[in-house]
Amino acid sequence: MKIGLPRTLLAGLVAIAVFMTGDGFELTFLSKYIVDQGFSSSQSSLMFTMYGLVAALAGWASGVLAEMFGAKRIMLIGASAWVVLHLLFVGVALPSGVYPLMLGVYALRGVGYPLFIYSFVVLMAQTIDPAKLASAMGWFWAAYSFGIGVFGAYLPSFTIPMVGEYYSLWLSLPFSIAGLLICLLMVPKSKGSGNSSMSNADKLRELSRGVAILVHNRQIALAAVVRVICNLTLYGFPVIMPLYLATTNNGGGAWFKVSQWSQIWGFQFVVTIFGNVFWGRMGDSHGWMRQMRWFGCWFCVIGTLGMYYIPQFFGANMVLMCADAVVLGLGISAFVPMGAVFPALALEHKGAAISAHNFASGLATFFGPLIATVLVSTIGFGGVCWTYAICYAIGSLVTFGIHPHQPGFDDRGHRIAAIERN
C-alpha cells in the first residue's frame, strides 16, 4: 500500500480508467455535432444539462445503494445501464433526429457512470485508513482523468478525421464494455455489503439521509457548494468550447478545429493525472481546505478566463492554450481531497456523507451545462466564462466555513504537532 491504495483495489482503478474512456469519448465534440445536425446551441446544452440532472440523482443514490447491496453489484448495474442506453442513443435516437427522443435517452444514460465510479468510492472508504484516504482519492481521480480526459479526448482527435463524429461515438462501446468486464472479473466485493437485516423502510430512510444531511449538517452543505463549484468548467467547457473555438455560433471565432480542441482538453487531463496524485499527497501532509481555497479556486479563476481571452488576443495559439490548460488542470485537481472531506464531516454517517458528496458532484454535471444553456444566448461565451470564474472566487470564500476532522490537524486546518510545539 505504498501508493496509498491496497493492491486488491488496483483493478478497480483500471476498470474506471477504461470505462470512463468510453464515457468521455463524446465530450469534446458531441455539442458541436448536435448543432451541426440543425439544432440550436441551447438545445445542445439542454441535453447535457438534463444528463447532469440524472447523473446527480444517480450520484446521490450510489453511496447508500453500494453500502446496502454491495459496491461491485451497483458498479455492474451502472455499467450495464450505460452500455444499453448508449446503444439506444447512438443506434436509434441520434439517427431519428427526433429531439425529445434524443434528449430523453441521453438524459437516462446519465444514470450509468455515477453508479459505476462512485460505488467504487464507497468500497475505498470501507477499505482504506481515513488518514490515507485523500491520497487514495488522488489515484482514483487520476484513473478517472486518464479515462474521461486523456484517452477520452485524444482518441477522438484521431478517429474523427478518419471516420467522422458519428462513427466515433460507436468506438466508445468497446472501452465501456471492457471496463464492465474488468469490474466483473477482478474488483473485490464489499466486506460489509448487502445488509439483509435492514427493512425496506430503513433502506429508504438511509437513502434519504444522503440529501437530509445537507439540511441538518451545515458543514456538509457548505462542502457541497464547493463540490459543485469545483467542477463547473469540467462539465461546462465541453459544451461551450467546441462551439466557441471551432464555430462562429454566438460569437465564436473558429480559431481551432475540433480535433485541436480535443487535444487541448486532453492535455489538461494529462496535467490532472499528475495533479491528482500530487495534490492528494499534499492535502494529507499540509491540510485539505487550505489547498483547495488558495490553489484550487484561484487557479481555476485564472484558467477559466484564460480559455476565453487567449484566443481573443492571440488567435489560434496552441502553446498558450496548452499553458492555460496546465493552470486549469492544476486548479481542478487541487480539489481532490473533497472525497475525504465529506466523510470526515459526518463520522457517524459516512454512507450518507458520501452520498451527499456524489450528489454534489453530479450537480456539477447539471449546473455546468445549465449556466451555459441559460446564459450563452444572452451574454455570450465571455459572460459564461466570467460566471464560472466568479463562482470559483465565491467557492474560495466558502471554504473558510468548512472544518473537517482531518487526522493530524485541528478543526482550523493547522497541524496538531505544530501547535503542541508552540
Language model features with spans:
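Cytoplasmic helix-loop-helix junction between adjacent transmembrane helices
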Residues: 105-143
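A late C-terminal transmembrane helix in Major Facilitator Superfamily
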Residues: 349-377
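Short amphipathic helix-loop junctions that connect adjacent transmembrane helices
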Residues: 29-42, 239-260
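Helix-to-loop junctions at the C-terminal end of transmembrane segments
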Residues: 59-70, 276-288
